[in-house]
Amino acid sequence: MKTLTTYAKYFTPISKIAFLFCFLMGNIAEATIKRAKFTNGFSGINRIITYTFEGSSTMIASATTPEQILFSKARDNTVIDPSYSNNVQQWSVFNNWIDTTVSGDTGYSFAGFSCVSNPCAQMQLPLRFYLDSAILEATSMRSADNQVIFKIRQHPELGVSFQLGMKKGIEDVKWLSNLQQEDFLLTTLQIYFGDAADISFKVRAKLHLLKLPTENTELPTMKLNLGQIKLQSWGINNWGRTKVSYRVQDVGSLNVQLKTPKIYFIQQQRQCILNSTYKKIPVTLKSVKKREFETNTEIEGGQFKLRVNCEDTTYNKFNGKWLFPVVKVTFRGEDGTMNDGTNELLRTQTGTGQATGVSLKIKRDSGNGDSVKYGLDSANMNNHGQFELKKQPSPAGGDQSAEETFKVYYVKDTTRGALTEGKVKAAATFTMSYQ
């Protein structure tokens, strides 16, 4: 008999400690730009032209999504683990941004800045960010994109990492890295007199769970003060033939505030159930003739299906909303199979009566002929060889299962010796991962 046996070696929901919750991205709406006050003075016979930004104001980035249901998603990093978040009807994967509207003063205007010298000097304006250390406390942790994670003092179970984006005129937004734990230089603005440039800012952030919740809770919308942007003073003396001095100064500040959506903390881990009949799956392969390999390098021998049920509302539903995990699987080959995440040949057993010169290949129902690549039996996210089952659970139509059908092929494999007749038997384990 020709058989391929697959085993469910691991069946565990994944739990880690820290999770990335959501992204917030700012768009300019109901926004204004700070404008400078012009003064013309003298120091003795020397003329001094000064542009001063006055007053402190606040830029508020408010999430347009009223609430987020947040739950764990494993990652190989045990401290900073990203998670999926689910709105009412669609997934919000951690690489997507949740839109916000930005109101208040959102930047600086350099319209009206002029000089009487020839040539005019270029302004070199350092722009710094000052962390609100009364609200945020720097940690040694970094987000997946290497941004510092700050603990929110009022809610120590939560952390936030963020970036400020800068937009000059009609140019695209340039996101500025935050690699420092305290105050840091954002960038140095290079502005020419007379170019009427407006500099506006955006904010994007990620929230991180720093402590595993012991129960389901919710956190109301927060107005989270991140810190303040401040333009550093710049000046140049006795410029050009006219010997005029120029000054630019900011005697106020631009406070940055993040208004989060309502956050639901989900204590239970999402999971699915593997039907007992799938825990050990013998796959009987059809017999093939040795001569068939004279014209074929691989021949279909049989098929099998993997299916898990995710309909348990205890784990996968909250406040009437389904919180389905993404169901992934890794196959690990036995009998000396190379499990490095790139190999797609499953070694067959050797010995008396066993065929030689042949291996097996398991092909996916992906529509493009993908083959299973064998990896270690780990449920960790991004495990080598891990892939997402073709059909995922969905609230639509009442089908809360994940499944895929696989086909098994004989493959002529010269690395296994000359092709001889005999039995073909192999085994592989599969590890389900609920992410």
From Swiss-Prot:
Name of the protein in its database record: Minor fimbrial subunit HifE
Species this chain originates from: Haemophilus influenzae
Gene: hifE
Any one annotated GO CC term: pilus
GO process terms (BP): cell adhesion involved in single-species biofilm formation
InterPro entries attached to this UniProt entry: Adhesion_dom_fimbrial, Adhesion_dom_fimbrial_sf, Adhesion_dom_sf, Bact_Fimbrial_Adh_Pro
Function, in words: May be a minor structural protein required for pilus biogenesis. May be the adhesive component in the pili.
Alphabetical keyword list: Fimbrium, Signal
Similarity remark: Belongs to the fimbrial protein family.
Subcellular locations according to the entry: Fimbrium
Signal peptide: 1-31
PANTHER family recorded: FIMBRIAL SUBUNIT ELFA, FIMBRIAL SUBUNIT ELFA-RELATED
